[in-house]
Amino acid sequence: MEQNTEKFSIFNSQFSILTSYFPDLTDRQKEQYAALYDLYTDWNAKINVISRKDIENLYPHHVLHSLGITHMLRFKPGSSVMDLGTGGGFPGIPLAILFPETHFHLVDSIGKKIKVGQAVAEAIGLENVSFRHCRGEEEKQLFDFVVSRAVMPLADLVKIVRKNIKKEQINALPNGLICLKGGELAHEILPFRNRAISKIGR
């Protein structure tokens, strides 16, 4: 009983942070985000998709970090986005909840991680997502944007996803790659210094 009370307290404090950043969430979106805590906690006990030391920080370190992309761009209805190296569904699933009229295609080379993402998406009733177990080099579809959370050096990532970017633009920003990375990036982004680069606090 005491353990359940502590778990609820952790969830409640973290979830309130999420809703403070996104006060206009619909009831449906709140339900979907709220369900992520138990779903990922349960799945993480079977398949390690999030550091077991970090699962209690699911909302600030994973959900909100994924939604940091909205600091740069709000996807227009009808947009298509590939999440490369999604792992258990980040940033794709949190973004798919927030943008129900955008399609998200989640790709990972590790099948068991895709299995977790599919199970979570099905459990919360996400209808604007698809999944594929493959390497990025194998995915040939075209998208408005590719998003990724630090799966590899930026130069390598650009080489892989360049083929996947549509030419026709419908969003406020030009089509391209949105990469969530931390640490010292000056050397890594130097070859792309003339591209749009924005710092997003975590």
Located regions from the model:
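S-adenosylmethionine
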Residues: 101-105, 109-202
